[in-house]
Amino acid sequence: MKKPLILSFLFSLTACTAVPPKNSDNICATFREKEDWYNDAKDSFEKWGVPIHVQMAIMHQESHFVADAQPPRTWLLGFIPWFRPSSAYGYAQAKDETWDDYLDSAGSWSADRDDFADATDFIGWYCNISHNRLGVSKSDAANLYLAYHEGHGGFHHKSFLKKPWLQQVAIKVAKRSTLFQHQLGTCEKELQSESWFFW
C-alpha cells in the first residue's frame, strides 16, 4: 500500500509544478494554454501602462517562462558546484534586493517571484520606474530591457555601451516584442471574449 501512496504524492507534487508553455514563441498559443496569463498581463498593463507584448518579451528573455528559473551555478576547480552569480529568481529573474523594493512600494506581502501574476506586475512596476526616472517610452522594449538588465543607475551611466553582447540581446527583445504585438493583434479579441465569459 505504501508504494501507491508515495507515487500518488509524487504525482500531486508534479501536477502542482508550473510547466512552461509548449510554444513560448507564440504569444497567442501561450495565452490559450495558460488561461490566466492574459488577464494577469492585462492587469499589469492597466496598472503600469507597459504593453502586454513588451512585458512578455522581457519575461521570455529572462526566464523563457520557467517559474523557478535561476542563473546556473559556477564551478570551483571545474567540477565542484559553487555559488550562483546572482540572486535572480523566477519568471522575471528579479534579484532579492529589487524584489524587496517592489514589495515595499507596490507588491503585497504574499507576492512570489515564481507566481506569474506577481512577476508580470513586477515587470510593469520596474519599467514604469524606468519611464519616470529615465524617460524611456513604455513601448521601447530595447531600452526598457537595457534598464531592466543594468539597473536604473547603470542605464543612466550608459554601462551597456561597454557590452556589445547586451545591446544585441536588447535588439532581440525588441524584435520579439514586435512579433508578440503582431501575434496578439490576431487573437486578443478572442482572448478578451473568453476572459469575459469566464469572469
Regions found by a protein language model. Name each.
Residues 19-191, 195-198:
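Catalytic glycan-binding domains that act on GlcNAc-containing polysaccharides
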Residues 4-13:
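Sec-dependent N-terminal signal peptides
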